[in-house]
UniProtKB/Swiss-Prot annotation:
Annotated stretches, region: Disordered: 201-223
Protein name as catalogued: UPF0441 protein YgiB
Protein family according to the UniProt entry: Belongs to the UPF0441 family.
Record's compositionally biased regions (Polar residues): 204-223
Length: 223
């Protein structure tokens, strides 16, 4: 009889564990799965202009043109602004800057810049743009302007960067990559001018943060 009781106790313990631990394990798994979905990346394509996009996407010429034009408007709104052409050229290189109309809320950092700007500012040319599906599964496309420097001394030299200075690798259009969904979110409008070299500093800081985040992720995966 004692042996029978012992067997029954063991069976009860196994049954209790199965009933109580399995839901906990499922709940933990569900949490990780939800976290993974929320942080999932988005696949985007990088193009230099609407023609590049149309060539890679036959039958999508209208969508490519719309995305390109929207990216240009976004670039005008969010690109780093400089009070002088010289400051912009020092950052992005000769032939890479254009004059942009002063925007509502734009304010030079000092009075000298205000007088020198004469109501207009300088900004880098849009070097390319990212194009991806609209968040939420819409039928349209989202776009994000990209900039690149041709000054070897700049941290943005030869790289695609967004208006916030985040680096997306070599400035080579026609490639596809995965980015966080936040990368395609609209950037805040530029409201002040940038000092010479200021955008390059932002790119350098962002690159350091990206490397640090990648290292942390690798260590976590490796235990």
């Amino acid at each position: 009889m004692k042996r029978t009781k012992s067997i029954h106790h063991a069976s009860f313990r196994k049954s209790w564990s199965a009933r109580h631990l399995t839901p906990v394990a499922l709940a933990v798994t569900a949490v990780f799965m939800l976290a993974g979905c929320e942080k999932s990346d988005e696949t985007v394509s990088l193009y230099q202009n609407a023609d590049d996009c149309s060539a890679a996407n036959p039958g999508k010429s209208a969508e490519c043109t719309t995305a390109y034009n929207n990216a240009l408007k976004e670039a005008e709104r969010t690109a780093p602004k400089y009070a002088t052409r010289e400051d912009c050229v020092a950052e992005f290189g000769e032939g890479q800057c254009q004059q942009a109309p002063a925007q509502a809320g734009m304010a030079p950092e000092n009075q000298a810049q205000s007088q020198q700007s004469s109501g207009s500012f300088w900004m880098p040319l849009m070097a390319g743009y990212m194009m991806g599906r609209l968040m939420g599964g819409g039928a349209g496309f989202a776009q994000q302007p990209l900039f690149s420097s041709k000054n070897p001394a700049s941290p943005a030299y030869g790289k695609y960067t967004d208006a916030a200075g985040k680096n997306y690798g070599a400035a080579q259009p026609g490639r596809t990559m995965t980015v966080p969904k936040t990368a395609m979110a609209p950037k805040p409008a530029t409201t002040t001018t940038v000092t010479r070299g200021g955008f390059g500093e932002s790119v350098a800081k962002q690159s350091t943060m990206q490397r640090s985040a990648a290292g942390t992720s690798t260590r976590s995966m490796g235990g």
